[in-house]
Design a protein with these regions (language model features):
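Phosphate-binding site recognition
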Residues: 1-173
């Protein structure tokens, strides 16, 4: 099959459904998995499109990719908090989508998860009651091991795995 490439989007509906099922549950949805397994695509494409199709206005979706130089300023948790709060201008529900949150955590903070300022910022945003927060990250030290402990019962993990053979085979027909 020389030169055979899969030039289509593989709908990972079971992961999308997990996010939909957790929508507005009052918890930070933490999407974890190894690098390049589709976390960002799930959040910024599939879930974003779902929100728009279900009637959410674009202004109510705050998307931030912390690995993008455009958002480098928001790697500081206080700046991130100010930015997000400045976008929340009504009582409607706002969907906060943050990609690669490990960029907002200092390496020395990883030694003591209770001192991580980002978690305090996200927990503070949850108190607004009209926000629904989704984050992704690849750092296993930061996300997978202690996610529920660090969020003090306010975290809900969605683990994403690389595409399976079953998904691939279904996509190629």
């Amino acid at each position: 099959m020389e030169g055979c490439y899969l030039n289509q989007i593989i709908q990972r509906n079971h992961y999308l459904q997990k996010l939909i099922d957790r929508r507005e549950n009052g918890l930070v949805k933490v999407i974890t998995g190894i690098r390049r397994c589709g976390k960002s695509f799930l959040l910024f494409n599939l879930f974003y499109d779902y929100l728009i199709e279900s009637g959410v206005k674009e202004e109510q979706i705050i998307s931030i990719a912390l690995d993008d130089d455009t958002f480098i300023k928001y790697r500081d948790p206080e700046e991130l908090s100010k930015f997000i709060r400045s976008k929340i201008t009504s009582k409607e529900t706002y969907y906060i989508l943050i990609d690669e949150v490990q960029y907002a955590i200092a390496k020395d903070e990883l030694k003591n998860p209770d001192s991580i300022r980002l978690y305090n910022v996200l927990n503070g945003l949850l108190r607004l009651r009209n926000v629904d927060i989704y984050v992704t990250g690849s750092s296993s030290k930061m996300l997978t091991k202690d996610v529920l402990t660090v969020f003090r019962g306010r975290g809900d993990e969605v683990r994403v795995y690389p595409i399976s053979f079953k998904e691939y085979y279904a996509a190629i027909g």
